[in-house]
Amino acid sequence: MSAPTAPQTTLSTAPFPNSEKRYLIGTLYPQVRVPVRAIRQSATLEMIGGLTRQRPNPDVLVPDTSGPYTDPRIHIDLRRGLPHARPWLAADARLEVQAERLSAPLDGAGPLPFPAVPLSRRARSGQAITQMQAARRGEITPEMEFVALRENLRQAEAFELAQQHPGQSFGAAIPREITPEFVRAEVARGRAVIPANVNHPELEPTIIGRNFRVKVNANLGTSIVTSSIEEEVEKMVWATRWGADTVMDLSTGRHIHQTREWILRNSPVPVGTVPIYQALEKVGGVAEELTWEVYRDTLIEQAEQGVDYFTVHAGVRLAHIPLTARRRTGIVSRGGSILAKWCLAHHRENFLYTHFREICEILSAYDITFSLGDGLRPGSIEDANDAAQFAELDTLGELTRVAWEHGVQTMIEGPGHVPMQLIRENMTRQLQVCQEAPFYTLGPLTTDIAPGYDHITSAIGAAQIAWYGTAMLCYVTPKEHLGLPDRQDVRDGVIAYRIAAHAADLAKGHPGAQARDNALSQARFEFRWEDQFNLALDPERARALHDATLPADAAKTAHFCSMCGPHFCSMKLSHDLRADDILNGMAEKAREFRAAGGELYLDRPEGTP
């Protein structure tokens, strides 16, 4: 048998076309360097007095979740991990460095462990280190300034692109400018979270809350059937390239610990997990054998590695399980079904519910965020908004208050499969029951008839619920219900959900959200084809579809595409109309001048100023 080797994969590190990685520098904390992508535009050609003039167009700044991978100045070596984006952690006296990790992985022989596993940190005894605790003290942390800069992107500088329709925000309080103080207040209130484990220094922080840009999560992870560490690391890089704000490692196969370590050390975005999956592996896949002690040790193991948020299915209570008996599709959450089976086998309350305060103490020591799982979410539109789903939601509201007592940041997971007319009730109930803690939803899928296209059926519901107030959307890929997504599925899912998130930002009236739309629309009207491609969410696909019928370089300057041709292009006709209007207007003024006698100056009638 050959010796295990480090993951080797071909990473997607090329910068986006005609784009430049830039960094916004913090004012309160000069160590803060926020990456943004500047899309350079070509000049507009104008005819003035018979002469052609070039009018420059501003760069368009867009959020950049790709991390150092698209910065050609940074050398990427998976075996060393990413450069630290939060260097201030090393000097934080409230943290203590542990001589060794308290937990050891139980994966057995497998791929080469990460070569340089860092020592872990945790809060010193009596120290309150979470973002929520700092916010309540009135402290603006480096992470808070980081996300404030990231949300604004200095869009006001592109004032000519700033025209925007007013939004309808359904009670959200979105300011004209996101300041560090506004971020602090939202985190203190529990209305926003910044998932940022102290053991994930590679992380570029992001904020999740209804008063901020809608975020997108991409699920990754090995299964017992297929995939490998190499593939999952590449999927992480690929997902963040296309706009995933966070990723979740949902590995259920072998070598869960090693897979997670490689992903964390190379991830520029927050990483979430569902710890019950690894806990189940530790007891041989037998749900009845799970114990609080096994789960607790799994939490600590993953906390020491740097996981930023945990899905914890503490809301699946013994009394709720009979409510699912008449459902069309029963309990579809993996975590929910595992815990339901344990509860019924022992006829005892869910141990995650009974030990919830102890879980809070673990998470607060590392500043890990709760993602309270919806283990009883509907798996078909027939089961939407039923008694089981809302009974669990009520419990999640109760647990949110407990988590906040411990200063632990918390978001709430939501459905699922919900027809469009029932979506708003989900958002309204969640805001009321969970005191406006951020909502994080899987879709929802609005119909069950389209396997292979569920990235579309769910993006419809995702755009709608995000408009109503959902803070983060968990993507769905074309492989949903069919198999483990590959690289192309990840891309399709992320792009579909970036569209949904952006549509919701526009509908809510988020400041600056329309700037990119305005820039692309202007480029389209002026037939600046390369700018149209570069401003698109997926420049490669836009260019490929155009070039499939008009591949010649000359087509990049043509005033038509293959859809309408040169004589039926509505925008070309609009240009002609404008030119005719200008010429006709000048001719009319010339006639008026001649009719007035052709004099440069006319006598002013008496009594006029």
Curated annotation (Swiss-Prot):
Cofactor binding remark: Binds 1 [4Fe-4S] cluster per subunit. The cluster is coordinated with 3 cysteines and an exchangeable S-adenosyl-L-methionine.
MF terms in GO: 4 iron, 4 sulfur cluster binding; carbon-carbon lyase activity; zinc ion binding
Xref: InterPro entries: ThiC, ThiC-associated_dom, ThiC/Bza_core_dom, ThiC/BzaA/B
Catalytic activity: 5-amino-1-(5-phospho-beta-D-ribosyl)imidazole + S-adenosyl-L-methionine = 4-amino-2-methyl-5-(phosphooxymethyl)pyrimidine + CO + 5'-deoxyadenosine + formate + L-methionine + 3 H(+)
Residues annotated for [4Fe-4S] cluster binding in this entry: C561, C564, C569
Cofactor annotation: [4Fe-4S] cluster
Gene3D superfamilies: 6.10.250.620, Radical SAM ThiC family, central domain (3.20.20.540)
Positions bound to substrate: N219, M248, Y277, H313, S333, R334, G335, D374, G375, L376, R377, E413, Y440
Residues the entry annotates as binding Zn(2+): H417, H481
Pathway: Cofactor biosynthesis; thiamine diphosphate biosynthesis
EC number(s) given by UniProt: 4.1.99.17
Superkingdom per UniProt: Bacteria
PANTHER family from the UniProt entry: PHOSPHOMETHYLPYRIMIDINE SYNTHASE, CHLOROPLASTIC (PTHR30557:SF1), THIAMINE BIOSYNTHESIS PROTEIN THIC (PTHR30557)
Protein role: Catalyzes the synthesis of the hydroxymethylpyrimidine phosphate (HMP-P) moiety of thiamine from aminoimidazole ribotide (AIR) in a radical S-adenosyl-L-methionine (SAM)-dependent reaction.
Protein's UniProt name: Phosphomethylpyrimidine synthase
Source species: Deinococcus geothermalis (strain DSM 11300 / CIP 105573 / AG-3a)
Gene (name only): thiC
